[in-house]
A protein has these predicted regions:
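Extended glycan-interaction surfaces of carbohydrate-active proteins
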Residues: 1-63, 85-116, 122-136, 140-161
């Protein structure tokens, strides 16, 4: 997957393709997308959203939600050891009371952007729930699945994460 038609640059938003059920997380296109996104946008577990010129002056840090999208891709592809390692890195970015920012500096880990950021917290909770379910054998690693539907199905069945 690429950022846009005719653009070869990576965009972390393409990690959402499996999350919406378009392709399975272990499909070759999904796996290749993870490889390309990591190669072009990752710095020690932190992902920039994209690095192409968008016309906005100044730079941005790595977006925590993007790193959690990566964690979800690893989890749903059955790469649980890698997912665990990434989660350990991401958990270090919370402050002394466990709050997370929108972004982080890839060198220092310093919180950047909106703080606290609800999207980062939502992604943290969902990623931990998916990883826990995967470790308990409650997520199938074959076939496409809308991650949100999985969560709703579990709640309706009385099996919250």
């Amino acid at each position: 997957m690429q950022q846009a038609a005719g653009v070869s640059a990576a965009d972390a938003a393409t990690l959402l393709v499996p999350a919406v059920g378009m392709l399975p997380s272990n499909h070759p296109v999904s796996l290749r997308t993870v490889e390309v996104v990591r190669a072009q946008l990752e710095k020690d577990g932190l992902l920039y959203r994209y690095l192409t010129d968008d016309g906005i002056e100044g730079g941005e840090g790595a977006f925590l939600i993007c790193s959690f999208w990566l964690l979800d891709c690893l989890t749903h592809a059955g790469r649980l050891e890698e997912a665990d390692e990434l989660l350990d890195k991401l958990l270090l970015l919370g402050n002394d009371v466990g709050l997370f920012a929108e972004q982080a500096d890839v060198v220092t880990g310093e919180a950047l952007g909106n703080f606290p950021q609800a999207f980062s917290h939502m992604a943290l909770v969902l990623s931990c729930a998916y990883l826990s379910a995967a470790k308990n054998g409650e997520i199938a690693f074959d076939g496409a699945a809308d991650y949100a539907e999985l969560a709703v199905d579990r709640l309706l069945a009385g099996r919250p994460f």
